[in-house]
Amino acid sequence: MATLPKRIIKETQRLMTEPAPGISATPATDNFRYFKVAISGPLDSPFEGGVFNLELFLTDDYPMSAPKVRFLTKIYHPNIDKLGRICLDILKDKWSPALQIRTVLLSIQALLSAPNPDDPLANDVAEHWKTNEKEAMARAREWTRLYAEAPVEN
């Protein structure tokens, strides 16, 4: 970790020693800018009971630019497309160097609790959410059962 900026070292150490509830983030052994992330589906959401794997990459200009994050686990969510890309303001125009990896991961976890079909990335899912929320949530639960119940890989 010696060649990394101190900030990345400190953030990584904090993620390892003080993990946020329901979130695991582990740096790759060969690239400390790349993290394997697992987020547990929040209680009382259609994603409850699932464990969602993501990848997070810190670009060379981090923290001046947001980390690159995407879901590896298939998910039925209006703000996450089929490639795993996430529609979240702090990953785009609302990014600030004051934000940290931990903040990003907590925000993604919160997005699982409160899908926003009015700011979609997956337009078909958002339309389904708007026209029949009950059915869309049932499909999200089904996808969670099908794709997100595997144990977390280390």
Swiss-Prot record:
Gene Ontology MF terms in the entry: ATP binding; ubiquitin conjugating enzyme activity
Species: Dictyostelium discoideum (Social amoeba)
Any single GO CC term annotated in Swiss-Prot or TrEMBL for this entry: nucleus
Functional summary from the UniProt entry: The ube2v/ube2n heterodimer catalyzes the synthesis of non-canonical poly-ubiquitin chains that are linked through 'Lys-63'. This type of poly-ubiquitination does not lead to protein degradation by the proteasome. Mediates transcriptional activation of target genes. Plays a role in the control of progress through the cell cycle and differentiation. Plays a role in the error-free DNA repair pathway and contributes to the survival of cells after DNA damage.
UBC core domain sequence ranges: 3-149
Protein name listed in UniProt: Probable ubiquitin-conjugating enzyme E2 N
InterPro entries given in the database record: UBQ-conjugat_E2_core, UBQ-conjugating_AS, UBQ-conjugating_enzyme/RWD
Subunit structure: Heterodimer with ube2v.
The enzyme's E.C. designation: 2.3.2.23
Parts of the chain that traverse the membrane: none
Entry keyword Nucleotide-binding: yes
Active site, renumbered: 87
Keywords per UniProt: ATP-binding, DNA damage, DNA repair, Nucleotide-binding, Transferase, Ubl conjugation pathway
